[in-house]
Regions:
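Phosphate-binding core of ATP-grasp and ATP-grasp-like enzymes
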Residues: 19-24, 72-115, 131-145, 151-157, ...
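Short acidic/polar alpha-helix capping motifs at helix-coil junctions
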Residues: 41-43, 50-54, 98-99, 110-114, ...
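C-terminal active-site "lid" helix and adjoining low-complexity regulatory extension at the edge
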Residues: 119-124, 151-220
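Short hydrophobic/aromatic-rich motifs at helix boundaries and adjacent loops
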Residues: 47-50, 60-61, 103-107, 118-119
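Signature of lipid phosphatidyltransferase scaffolds
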Residues: 124-127, 135
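Short, flexible active-site loops
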Residues: 1, 113-119
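Active-site nucleotide/adenylate-binding loops and adjacent lid/helix of ATP-dependent enzymes
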Residues: 1-75, 127-130
Length: 220
């Protein structure tokens, strides 16, 4: 995603000028900075060679994404930066269930999204994140939402992003989920299976209710 850390008013002014003129690319970083980040995260020769072998595919993927997404212009969003976070917490709420994991920051970067460094230990998840995600999803009347949280020492967990799409493979790695009573349920699931299950259950309840109403009308 096109997310940058702006540290001065001068940088903010420059960014506004850019976004309200020629605009900016929807997919960052550039090829070389992405290559450097991947190389810096290697842990040995074999890992290094694997990264090098994958780079042509990564470059093609970035080029493809940039073709699909036009330059962004005419708007700019600013969000408070919350320092001191080594990770964010991704919570996916589906039908009263909450799946969660930590995404560790990229080396030398403040961002966790897209790092691929995921920790699935449920004991590390702040239960406040679970409660907030389930409540917001219910309040919005949504069936499925993904939340990204960071933690502020004074304010506690803060939502930095809400999405309706997410990577299913990362979700499937969760060893279980919490229900709306914060009871833990073991098992691995695919989000699309749960969404379909909930949809069919809702249709079944609707059909049963409709049938009951028709029978009541006929008796009258």
């Amino acid at each position: 995603a096109n997310v940058r850390l702006v540290t001065t008013a001068k940088e903010a002014t420059k960014l506004c000028g850019e976004m309200f003129s020629r605009g900016g690319k929807a997919v960052t970083p550039g090829y070389m900075s992405d290559f450097r980040r991947k190389i810096e995260s290697t842990t040995g020769l074999r890992h290094f060679l694997t990264k090098v072998q994958r780079m042509p595919g990564a470059v093609l993927s970035i080029r493809h994404q940039r073709r699909l997404m036009p330059r962004q212009q005419g708007y700019v969003y600013f969000q408070d930066y919350v320092p001191g976070n080594t990770h964010d917490t991704r919570v996916v709420a589906i039908g009263g269930r909450a799946f969660a994991f930590r995404r560790m920051n990229r080396p030398g970067d403040f961002r966790a999204s897209g790092s691929g460094n995921i920790v699935y230990d449920p004991g590390l998840i702040d239960p406040r994140c679970i409660r907030i995600a389930l409540k917001v999803t219910a309040d919005l009347g949504a069936r499925c939402l993904a939340f990204d949280f960071v933690t502020d020492d004074a304010q506690g967990p803060l939502i930095v992003e809400v999405s309706y799409t997410f990577v299913a493979g990362a979700f499937h790695g969760c060893p279980g989920y919490w229900d709306d009573c914060l009871t833990w349920h073991e098992g691995q699931f695919w989000p699309q299976d749960l969404i379909l299950h909930d949809l069919l259950a809702a249709l079944g309840h609707r059909a049963a209710r409709s049938g009951s109403e028709r029978r009541g009308t006929n008796r009258q």
